[in-house]
Design a protein with these regions (language model features):
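The structured alpha-helical core of multi-pass membrane proteins
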Residues: 5-13, 122-124, 171-174
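Export/targeting segments at the very N-terminus of extracytoplasmic proteins
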Residues: 8, 12-70
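Peptidoglycan-targeting cell-wall enzymes and recognition modules
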Residues: 29-50, 73-138
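Solvent-exposed, polar/charged alpha-helical surfaces in well-ordered, non-transmembrane soluble domains
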Residues: 49, 53, 69, 118, ...
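Metal- and O2-centered redox machinery and metal/ROS homeostasis
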Residues: 56-57, 72, 112-113, 180
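Short, functionally critical alpha-helical segments immediately adjacent to catalytic or ligand/cofactor-binding
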Residues: 63-78, 149
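Residue-level detector of well-ordered alpha-helical segments, enriched
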Residues: 64-68, 88, 116, 143-144
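Active-site or metal-binding loop neighborhoods of secreted/extracellular toxin and effector enzymes
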Residues: 142-180
Length: 180
């Protein structure tokens, strides 16, 4: 079930094109630097909306869903088939990659994107429970993005500005659509 906030956002004044939606996300990110802006394109914005829609349908609060999706954009553009240094959207490696492969086989009918987001939710309730608890206490998309990066992803190179900037863009787009 879609959260009412997200459902209202998606129903109100839907943009005429993905290009317009992308421009809205970028323009609404007042503190975005050029590095943050390079992550946004029409396909990623569309995928971001799909991810937020899916996560909120799984009872994830919208601001936390935005933080998670902002990290997925920064990690590899929400690409489900990425294999830079790991597997999938969040570049799982080692035991986490093996666990994902095992779980993926048990989710028939779900899209690959949904399977990967489902695995994130599974990890936040089990092996990454500490990250899940910390994330549940986030109050803004930016805070959720920071917590998810530090406690769940644990990347080699911290890039707070990029991930928090993307979360701000998603939050501002939602606020703009609700006010219209």
């Amino acid at each position: 079930m879609l959260s009412k906030d997200l459902e209202n956002v998606l129903k109100q004044r839907l943009p005429q094109s993905l290009k317009e939606l992308t421009r809205d996300v970028i323009d609404s990110t007042k503190n975005a630097n050029s590095h943050t802006r390079k992550f946004m394109n029409p396909e990623r914005v569309q995928r971001a909306h799909e991810g937020i829609r899916f996560l909120t349908s799984q009872n994830v609060p919208m601001h936390i869903a935005m933080g998670i999706i902002a990290n997925g954009i920064a990690e590899n553009g929400l690409s489900t088939d990425a294999h830079k240094h790991g597997l999938g959207i969040f570049q799982w490696i080692g035991a986490r990659a093996r666990q994902f492969r095992n779980m993926r086989a048990n989710l028939p009918g779900a899209t690959e994107f949904e399977k990967q987001l489902s695995f994130v939710l599974h990890e936040l309730k089990t092996t990454e429970r500490a990250a899940g608890v910390a994330l549940a206490n986030a109050r803004t998309p930016e805070e959720a993005a920071r917590i998810f990066m530090v406690k769940f992803e644990r990347p080699k190179h911290l890039n707070f500005d990029v991930r928090q900037g993307l979360a701000t863009g998603l939050r501002n787009l939602t606020s703009t659509r609700q006010e219209a």
